A protein has these predicted regions:
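Accessory interaction regions appended to the cores of large information-processing enzymes
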Residues: 1-210
Length: 210
């Protein structure tokens, strides 16, 4: 999406508002997944709502990126941990001084967009720099996570995530909505669904009658 972290996004957004008097609506970036259906038809899908259901007969591929990180060697350990969490594959390591190491990594674009740069800055105390370029398309191990409020699907909350993060993200989104949605006159159930089942669920208690 062109921004190196949330701070960069906020700075550019504020400048556009102040200097050009623009009213901006900021939305999450989307990724084009390549879906090949059982009948041989191939299409690129951006909207999570159009993503295949769990168990559907379809082959899914996603874009990967080639990432280059320059950082002090002292932060290699924390960076390796971060890369593992973001499905990064280190393909080359080069040390060109006592103070700088270059890592070349391949990783899914969706993981780069999952706040990777901000987390990298935190892991390296701000010393790391990052650049990336598009690489290729690869088979994707992903699922669609849906959110239901009071038994109704809310398409705006649907997202495509790595299968290994399904349970964690399901719990996080349910807890977040539970903390911000207002109470009603009736009990409101919040559910996160993926892998063909309800992964996480919480209920907002009803308002007490006077």
């Amino acid at each position: 999406c062109g921004f190196l972290g949330m701070l960069h996004l906020e700075i550019i957004t504020e400048r556009l508002k102040r200097e050009f008097n623009l009213n901006l609506i900021i939305t999450a970036p989307s990724i084009a997944y390549e879906i090949t259906w059982h009948n041989g038809k191939t299409e690129h899908i951006y909207a999570p709502s159009r993503f295949p259901d769990h168990g559907a007969s379809a082959t899914i591929r996603e874009p990967w990126v080639r990432v280059q990180i320059i950082l002090p060697p002292d932060y290699l350990g924390s960076t390796m941990t971060l890369l593992h969490d973001h499905e990064g594959e280190i393909i080359d390591t080069e040390t060109f001084s006592d103070e700088r190491t270059i890592l070349t990594i391949l990783m899914p674009l969706r993981e780069l967009m999952r706040n990777f740069f901000d987390q990298l800055k935190n892991a390296t105390s701000g010393y790391a720099s990052l650049s990336y370029e598009m690489s290729d398309m690869r088979p994707a191990d992903v699922e669609r996570l849906d959110v239901l409020v009071a038994g109704e699907l809310v398409p705006a909350f649907s997202r495509v995530i790595g299968t290994r993060r399904v349970e964690l993200e399901a719990q996080q989104v349910v807890e977040k909505l539970h903390s911000i949605l207002p109470r009603q006159m009736f009990v409101t159930k919040i559910q996160a669904s993926a892998l063909g089942r309800i992964i996480s669920s919480r209920s907002i208690s009803a308002l007490k009658k006077d």
